Amino acid sequence: MRVRLAAIEPLNLKVFDFDYDLTFQVMFLSPDEKVYSRYGGRCEQGPDARQSLAGLRFTMESVLAEHRSRSPRFAPRETGKPFFIADIAPPRGLGRCIHCHQAKEVIYDRMDREGKWNLDMAFRYPPPDNLGFVLDVDRSNVVKDVDRGSPATDAGVQPGDQITVLNCVPVHSFGDAGFALDRAPKRGSITVSWFRGDREMSGKITLPDRWRRTDISWRPSLQGLVASPRVFGEDLTAQEREEHGLTATQLAFWQKSKVPSQAAKAGIRPGDLILGFDNQTLEMDAYRFLLYVRSKYVTGETVKVNLIRNGRRLNLPMTLE
């Protein structure tokens, strides 16, 4: 039976546990509120970059097959007393429509006041791309691409494999994969199972440092955390790059004459030759660097600004705001 829910207030969030920054989410439930699957997802490329009607149909058929199996599998969920957004929403928020992303803001605000918030929470529901495999939009749990040398490659995953379980969560869709990775530890490894043709296979994916990091600039609930590099200017010419011993494609730009207060406080001066942050050689121009910082860092983090001044290389610590 299909039910359209347009408000989050009456929902038990222990059941309807998903990425609340999304504009569209489908939950496949059993009559006793066990979760078969979650369909929905997005990224910085746009609200529909990770979903399609064909993908929804594929997931529906996959879930129906699961439902008809002898031992249907369900996603893990928190049990116990139901939890509603009204339990923690401020009184002024009640009696009005609360959007899903606002529910997330209320939850995060409460955690912050209780001292439970940390920056890792900004990177919830990381996509499988972060571990090196991309799911097909129209065939929701089928691997489209695998990055060479990635954790997914090391685990044995190949394009065309059909992911069935990730971190103990049944996978029918991109949304299921995100839910599975949201539950994954900060470091260590997670299990993954897949079908390659008729063969059932499995492996372990090792979680690298900062593996959760992804672009949060599209998330309504996290706009206050989107960082700015606070340095910007004109890219070096080919001749200037040659004079400074730099490659033709690596990040290198002259800091413009107006230096923002945060950068000035860190010691950045007009005319500094900026090479990037944290000793990473980045293949991009100054504009792409702006987008890179927005996707990889959050406000409050301290970075080391790598620059050249009068022929000397310097690394100046700066807190992003």
PLM regions: where:
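Thiol-based oxidoreductase modules, predominantly thioredoxin-like and allied folds used
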Residues: 1-11
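Structural micro-motif
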Residues: 18-27, 272
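A short, hydrophobic beta-strand/beta-hairpin element that forms part of a small beta-sheet core
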Residues: 23-42
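PDZ/PDZ-like peptide-tail recognition elements
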Residues: 95-145, 204-256, 315-321
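Conserved PDZ fold ligand-binding element
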Residues: 152-175, 263-286
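PDZ-domain C-terminal substructure recognizer with occasional recognition of PDZ-binding tails
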Residues: 164, 179-217, 269, 275, ...
